[in-house]
């Protein structure tokens, strides 16, 4: 026999507001990331911006082709996928900068930079894919929607981050007469010779870590306040 696991009714006004809020979150995320990448990585930031745009377009296209339902948790999964895609580009660009610092040509630095950054990029994405796969296998309702978009977004992020961005860079620098820049006046002035003495703050870190640990132990002892998803009942949004 069929059993209703979850039932949710959303009025048209709340639904429209939720959709608008979700897409506004995606737009603001993109805007903040674009500005950050351009300010920090100069013209190389444009490659990351193009790759991120393609990532979102491909993800939405696959969701549409699969006739998947886009939910608010699904939008959250998209935003998380954008973050993972940015992380991949940061790892790659920083590795290329290290290769350039060794005196290599821009063309060779791109080849070696992508080759030597593959392992950390794959590690991060595979860890997220495993988590998303577990949520997809055992999750229901909103959790399933989140896991679906997260799986797609992270998988496509690998394709765009490792293949598409590399293709753009290699085509642009193939002649050896032009290349992308990886520094701006701001990033040079603030970060190129930055030195942060984190060890001097270790005592403060010990105290903060101890407080967080005690709070975590306390939450386990006292238990959690479960929502209607776990305890059952009704929830009203007015």
List the predicted regions and their residue ranges.
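Extracytoplasmic
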Residues: 1-10, 17-18, 22
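Juxtamembrane segments of multi-pass membrane proteins
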Residues: 211, 216-238
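Helix-loop junctions and hydrophobic alpha-helical segments within the transmembrane domains
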Residues: 100-126
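Interfacial segments of transmembrane alpha-helices in multi-pass membrane proteins
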Residues: 16-71, 137-141, 200
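Short helical (or helix-break) motifs at transmembrane helix termini and adjacent helical loops
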Residues: 81-101, 121, 158-164
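Transmembrane helix-loop junctions at the membrane interface of multipass transporters and ion channels
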Residues: 65-69, 131-148, 220-223
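Small-residue-enriched core segments of transmembrane alpha-helices in multipass membrane transport
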Residues: 46-67, 78-85, 146-161
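Interfacial helix-loop-helix hairpins and adjacent transmembrane helices
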Residues: 163-216
